[in-house]
Amino acid sequence: MRNIRIDVVEDDPASCQLVLDYLNRYQQENGEQFTVSVFDDGARIVEKYTPVYDILLLDIEMSEMDGMAAARRIRERDDKVVIVFITTAPQYAISGYEVRALSYLLKPLPWFAFSQELKKSIDMVRRNGDDSMLIETGNGQMRLNLADILYL
């Protein structure tokens, strides 16, 4: 199995560290391998985003650009990435449907709920299949669908 590429977008250092600790625990307990990137604001991930991630773990309330706005912009470029919101703001839960978020977790984040949603996310990534590959470009990496390759 290949590594699952996860991006954590969280502006609170303690919350970010908890998510990273949970990801490490999940890897150890379930034999998974993750490649994890971290951004501390929605604007930063939108600015640098290329469709190479499998799962986005997004906070909503952040200073420059909130996670919901970031998710909308990311969806314009990547319709495959699995989005999970992790936030203290329950009032935005319905808005998550606009960006086809898989789930919405509330802080304080309990391990069991996190692990269950992460399992669902990984299952969705694998179920959707990955008929793509990462290639290096002049601007970094991008995901190329194998069906789009006409000639080598």
Question: PLM features: what roles do these ranges have?
Answer:
Residues 1-7:
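Non-catalytic signal-transmission and effector/linker regions of two-component phosphorelay proteins
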Residues 12-37, 76:
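Two-component/phosphorelay signaling modules centered on CheY-like receiver
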Residues 47, 53-127:
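CheY-like receiver
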Residues 4, 34, 81:
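Switch/coupling loops of ABC transporter nucleotide-binding domains
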Residues 113-152:
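Conserved binding/recognition cores within well-folded domains
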Residues 35-55:
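Acidic, metal-coordinating helix/loop segments flanking the phosphotransfer/catalytic sites
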Residues 10-12, 88:
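Acidic di-acidic motifs
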